[in-house]
């Protein structure tokens, strides 16, 4: 389980990116993190694995306070934190299998890493994961020949090869079409349930978050303003998170000037 207590982040400019964030994410739960740009969502993910150092507060992962670890201890702890990135972070010239196996580079010695020599058990697990994410036919295909959805599946398999306890997912569907986005979110959900993973997903697509997350946390100006189930994310709650907007509108409405311009154009033809 992940527990975050009173986490704050102040940048050297004085700007507060996070203000006393307190959360618990139990094993097996998929939590979606929503909010406007600049709300602190990406900063929160990066503070959890200490890619960004928090200013104050604590981050507990299965009984270990990550904020108190030294460099060596943090390196060990990060093995239990899988990251899935919006931009996939694949090595384009390497094959699917080589990219997946790169998730194990921190587990083997220098020479094994240098020559990319992995234990047979690790290779077998990589093949099993490729089959699980739907890429069993593409182990030797180069990453630069894959579609966006396939690349994201490689990223998921690579993260799972670490055998993580926590999965941090940053905008996994930002570059994907609606059908592929649903497939990726469904896959993440299934894997979290199968493996008992705590999952935090930073996502801008609110309807997609409501469809697949068991819990939604809304951030605004670095503070938690909503924490609850998807079905309670009403228009008034969305206004609190994002600011005033007509959340019931079905599409863009033309203002009176646009309508007048259209009418004038029709009249002249």
From Swiss-Prot:
Keyword DNA repair included in the entry's annotation: no
Keywords: ATP-binding, Cell inner membrane, Cell membrane, Membrane, Nucleotide-binding, Phosphonate transport, Translocase, Transport
CDD domains with a match to the protein in the record: ABC_PhnC_transporter
Documented EC number(s): 7.3.2.2
Region (Disordered): 246-269
Start and end residues of each ABC transporter domain: 2-246
Catalysed conversion reaction: phosphonate(out) + ATP + H2O = phosphonate(in) + ADP + phosphate + H(+)
Single GO molecular function: ATP hydrolysis activity
Any one GO cellular component localisation term in the record: plasma membrane
SUPFAM superfamilies xrefs: P-loop containing nucleoside triphosphate hydrolases (SSF52540)
UniProt enzyme class: translocase
Cited InterPro entries: AAA+_ATPase, ABC_transporter-like_ATP-bd, ABC_transporter-like_CS, ABC_transpr_PhnC, MetN_ABC_transporter-like, P-loop_NTPase
Source organism superkingdom: Bacteria
Oligomeric form and interacting partners: The complex is composed of two ATP-binding proteins (PhnC), two transmembrane proteins (PhnE) and a solute-binding protein (PhnD).
PANTHER family xrefs: AMINO ACID IMPORT ATP-BINDING PROTEIN, PHOSPHONATES IMPORT ATP-BINDING PROTEIN PHNC
Function field: Part of the ABC transporter complex PhnCDE involved in phosphonates import. Responsible for energy coupling to the transport system.
Protein family (similarity comment): Belongs to the ABC transporter superfamily. Phosphonates importer (TC 3.A.1.9.1) family.
Protein name, entry field: Phosphonates import ATP-binding protein PhnC 2
Protein source organism: Synechococcus sp. (strain JA-2-3B'a(2-13))
Encoding gene, per UniProt annotation: phnC2
């Amino acid at each position: 389980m992940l527990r975050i207590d009173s986490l704050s982040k102040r940048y050297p400019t004085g700007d507060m990116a996070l203000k006393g964030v307190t959360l618990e994410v139990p094993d097996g739960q998929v939590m979606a993190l929503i909010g406007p740009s600049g709300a602190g969502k990406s900063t929160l993910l990066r503070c959890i694995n200490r890619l960004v150092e928090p200013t104050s507060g604590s981050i507990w992962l299965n009984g270990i306070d990550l904020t108190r670890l030294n460099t060596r201890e943090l390196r060990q702890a990060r093995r239990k934190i899988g990251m899935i990135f919006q931009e996939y972070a694949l090595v384009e010239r390497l094959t699917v299998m080589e990219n997946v196996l790169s998730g194990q580079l921190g587990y083997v010695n220098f020479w094994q890493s240098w020559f990319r020599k992995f234990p047979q058990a690790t290779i077998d697990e990589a093949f099993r994961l490729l089959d699980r994410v739907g890429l069993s036919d593409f182990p030797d295909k180069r990453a630069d020949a894959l579609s966006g959805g396939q690349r994201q599946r490689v990223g998921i398999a690579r993260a799972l090869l670490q055998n993580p306890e926590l999965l941090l997912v940053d905008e996994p569907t930002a570059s994907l079409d609606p059908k592929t986005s649903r497939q990726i979110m469904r896959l993440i959900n299934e894997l979290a349930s199968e493996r008992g993973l705590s999952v935090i997903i930073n996502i801008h697509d609110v309807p997609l978050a409501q469809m697949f997350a068991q819990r939604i946390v809304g951030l605004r100006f670095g503070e938690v303003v909503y924490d609850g189930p998807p079905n309670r994310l009403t228009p008034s709650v969305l206004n609190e998170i994002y600011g005033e907007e007509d959340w019931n509108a079905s599409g863009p409405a033309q203002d009176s000037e646009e309508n007048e311009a259209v009418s004038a154009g029709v009249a002249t033809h």
